[in-house]
A protein has these predicted regions:
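Core beta-strand elements of the Rossmann-like FAD/NAD(P) dinucleotide-binding domain
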Residues: 7-10, 103-113
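Short, hinge-like loop/turn segments at secondary-structure boundaries
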Residues: 52-57, 133, 156-157
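Rossmann-like dinucleotide/flavin-binding elements
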Residues: 3-40, 134, 140-175
């Protein structure tokens, strides 16, 4: 998609490129709707940090979050969806001629429908000493990417629910 400041118009604009946003892109584009997916980060959202997702439709044996995101992206792209990454949505307005989203560096995009699939953010521990080490030994949801670097180290997982257990199991293969 060419970067320009002139407003473009899409039938469907999806904010977020995690599993929910990618699913919306597949369905919208497969129905022939001009579809644009915008994400302030990259492809897959938090799902990319999961080594195994077992509760997603169509994958009874599970799939890695990264692979799920890549396959969904390819499927949406085949149907004609467009993608813009590293763009933050700074404004959403309803005007007399439709909905308009303003992107950080891209300008305005018009759409008949805007779907917000912004996902979630990791709950931080809130300990200043740990925050200073973020990415330098302290990771939030980084089990997949950080695991090989943990070889021979003691690893501690703080958190609950399914994703913490999956991270602990995945990290145990390396640490």
């Amino acid at each position: 998609l060419e970067m320009r400041r002139v407003p473009i118009t899409k039938r469907v604009l999806v904010v977020g490129a995690g599993p929910a946003g990618l699913s919306a892109a597949v369905y919208g584009a497969s129905e022939g709707f001009s579809t644009l997916v915008v994400d302030e980060g990259g492809l897959g959202g938090q799902a990319t940090s999961s080594s195994l997702i077992r509760n997603y439709l169509g994958f009874p044996r599970g799939i890695s979050g990264r692979r799920l995101a890549q396959q969904a992206y390819e499927q949406a792209w085949v149907f004609g969806a467009n993608f813009v990454f590293m763009q933050r949505v700074t404004d959403l307005r309803r005007e007399h001629d439709g909905l308009f989203v303003t992107l950080s560096d891209f300008g305005r995009v018009g759409a008949r429908a805007v779907l917000l699939a912004t996902g979630a953010s990791y709950r931080r521990v809130g300990v200043p000493a740990l925050e200073a080490l973020n990415g330098l030994g302290v990771f939030y949801g980084g089990a997949v990417s950080a695991a090989p670097a943990m070889a021979g180290h003691d690893v501690y997982v703080l958190g609950g629910a399914n994703s913490a257990g999956q991270s602990a199991l995945h990290l145990s293969r390396y640490a």
